[in-house]
Amino acid sequence: MVQRDMSKSPPTAAAAVAQEIQMELLENVAPAGALGAAAQSYGKGARRKNRFKGSDGSTSSDTTSNSFVRQGSADSYTSRPSDSDVSLEEDREAVRREAERQAQAQLEKAKTKPVAFAVRTNVSYSAAHEDDVPVPGMAISFEAKDFLHVKEKFNNDWWIGRLVKEGCEIGFIPSPVKLENMRLQHEQRAKQGKFYSSKSGGNSSSSLGDIVPSSRKSTPPSSAIDIDATGLDAEENDIPANHRSPKPSANSVTSPHSKEKRMPFFKKTEHTPPYDVVPSMRPVVLVGPSLKGYEVTDMMQKALFDFLKHRFEGRISITRVTADISLAKRSVLNNPSKHAIIERSNTRSSLAEVQSEIERIFELARTLQLVVLDADTINHPAQLSKTSLAPIIVYVKISSPKVLQRLIKSRGKSQAKHLNVQMVAADKLAQCPPELFDVILDENQLEDACEHLADYLEAYWKATHPPSSSLPNPLLSRTLATSSLPLSPTLASNSQGSQGDQRTDRSAPIRSASQAEEEPSVEPVKKSQHRSSSSAPHHNHRSGTSRGLSRQETFDSETQESRDSAYVEPKEDYSHDHVDHYASHRDHNHRDETHGSSDHRHRESRHRSRDVDREQDHNECNKQRSRHKSKDRYCEKDGEVISKKRNEAGEWNRDVYIRQ
């Protein structure tokens, strides 16, 4: 009967009957007290259930769950984007695509535009994770000390340009504003990371020594600039161990000694600008084998100038610089308070003259021709390391000091008199690490050295002249028209004027090399490749009691006419000029009173001894090492060796123009 009632009753009645059966079982097992409590709780539960039963027989729990389902479906319906939201999103996408299309078009147009200026980078930058590039995938990555050609400004955050390396195409370069913002964001993240780590951890040893370097090196993807290039790591690695001690000590934080130890870290955070403006074409500067102004050095460099003039005809400007451009340090030119100190010092060149020369070199480089400087006062790479010229330093090297000694002595008594100062200068160059030079020419034969230098410059030419920008440069004809050199000594003398006008003549014409003629033999040089910045300038160096004339002093009494005319007529007789030159120099320097007469005697005896000494020098120099292959920083792959175009002279055998 119970089963019949259950089958006829609704499901809720069956549930109630089942509960009653359970209660009966509990009454049989539970004690009286527990039975009363269970009955009371059952009664209350039954009343609650009856009170929340729905009209359809469902309980309150069912009703609640159903209401949740209905509410969720309503919410999901109302969260769908409206028509206005969809149209707004489409408009944004259309604007983004249009901006990208315009940026791509501007990028294409910039390929044929001339280079506006060039910069050398002081930081590294990776575009791998950049998401705000005007054209995705077109940002340019670079390392510190790379060179960039900038075509134009795209917006406040991006420039258009290219990396000066063969095979690199035009793209977007982050502007200094963008790099500075990235640097600040990165520093802020580093500080926050250090703060949170010091709060959460009890170990204070990582607060300065470990957290800061690691947070810098694990740069978040959104921060692509490499802050390590600013040199902070070097200072942090020097922090003493007691500042990394895990023992928290008040003295270690507040003592003056601790503050002194931390100061270098904060001083280093004086950020270097991300870019330095440099000439569009890096000027080539020759140094070595010894001091300029002496016959051996001048003869070897003159042979290279002649070769370059013929090899790169139409693509090269060779210009003479008489001002002391080593004074053109950025810290001096940008700081007016230092100008008076330089002006009061005993220098040959005024700052105005130096500044004018620097501007002229920049203007020559805008033509994107190769620029070669015959710089009178530059004898060491350190002299130009802090200037804005970023030169290609070519080291003309004689590996054996004995060979250099023989060469100097073979030039006569006037040169042997200054043997010591020349040997000291050569030794200082030999002590420089190879990284200070871009090219080291240490070959025994002139033609090998010339081809080595030509290979490097050909690679540099290709790096600065990509196929996509092969249009003629409108600046070229204008610059060359204002910088041409007179072709004869007569024209040179008419255009130059007196010695007093020499230093104020700012035309400093581009030099034509002399006609290639065979002449006597002097020797050699070996050469390879590298870069610049080391010991102090020594063009005015003195060694013990034997004091040699530096190039700087010698040119004080030499006329511009005698220098320029010698480039055109290398075989003319210089005896009268040199006698006058040394006579006037005795007024300058009383310690060299016998210089003029010894030079005259040297002119008479030099030709008699040259043939014998030449053969001895040649045999000894041939024992030197064979040529090292240059590592070309402008080629991404090994370039082909350019076929040799031999000059008329086959060795370092030219009796070229000698500057004393």
UniProtKB/Swiss-Prot annotation:
Q: Where in the cell is it found?
A: Cell membrane, Sarcolemma
Gene3D superfamilies associated with the record = P-loop containing nucleotide triphosphate hydrolases, SH3 Domains
One GO cellular component term of this record is: voltage-gated calcium channel complex
Q: Which ranges are annotated Polar residues under compositional bias?
A: 66-85
Q: Which cysteines are joined by disulfide bonds?
A: none
Q: Where is the composition biased (Basic and acidic residues)?
A: 560-602, 610-623, 632-641
Please tell me, according to the UniProt entry, what happens when changing D298A.
Reduces binding to RRAD
For this UniProt entry, the molecular function terms from Gene Ontology, in alphabetical order, are: actin filament binding; calcium channel activity; voltage-gated calcium channel activity; voltage-gated calcium channel activity involved in regulation of presynaptic cytosolic calcium levels
**What single Pfam family name could you report for this chain, choosing any that match?**
VGCC_beta4Aa_N
Write down the position(s) of the site called Required for CaMK2D-binding. Answer: L549
Region annotated Disordered, chain positions: 39-101, 190-261, 486-641
| Keyword annotations from UniProtKB, A to Z | Brugada syndrome, Calcium, Calcium channel, Calcium transport, Cell membrane, Disease variant, Ion channel, Ion transport, Membrane, Phosphoprotein, SH3 domain, Transport, Voltage-gated channel
Phosphoserine PTM positions: S204, S207, S218, S550
Bias class Low complexity marks the residues at 55-65, 197-209, 486-495
The similarity annotation says: Belongs to the calcium channel beta subunit family.
SUBUNIT field: Component of a calcium channel complex consisting of a pore-forming alpha subunit (CACNA1S) and the ancillary subunits CACNB1 or CACNB2, CACNG1 and CACNA2D1. The channel complex contains alpha, beta, gamma and delta subunits in a 1:1:1:1 ratio, i.e. it contains either CACNB1 or CACNB2. Interacts with CACNA1C. Interacts with RRAD; interaction may be involved in beta-adrenergic regulation of heart rate and contractile force. Interaction with RRAD regulates the trafficking of CACNA1C to the cell membrane. Interacts with TMIGD2. Interacts with CAMK2D. Interacts with CBARP. Interacts with CAMK2A.
Name the job this protein performs: Beta subunit of voltage-dependent calcium channels which contributes to the function of the calcium channel by increasing peak calcium current. Plays a role in shifting voltage dependencies of activation and inactivation of the channel. May modulate G protein inhibition. May contribute to beta-adrenergic augmentation of Ca(2+) influx in cardiomyocytes, thereby regulating increases in heart rate and contractile force. Involved in membrane targeting of the alpha-1 subunit CACNA1C.
What is the name listed in the Swiss-Prot or TrEMBL entry for this protein?
Voltage-dependent L-type calcium channel subunit beta-2
Organism for this UniProt entry: Homo sapiens
What is the taxonomic lineage of the source species?
Eukaryota, Metazoa, Chordata, Craniata, Vertebrata
Provide the gene name from the record.
CACNB2
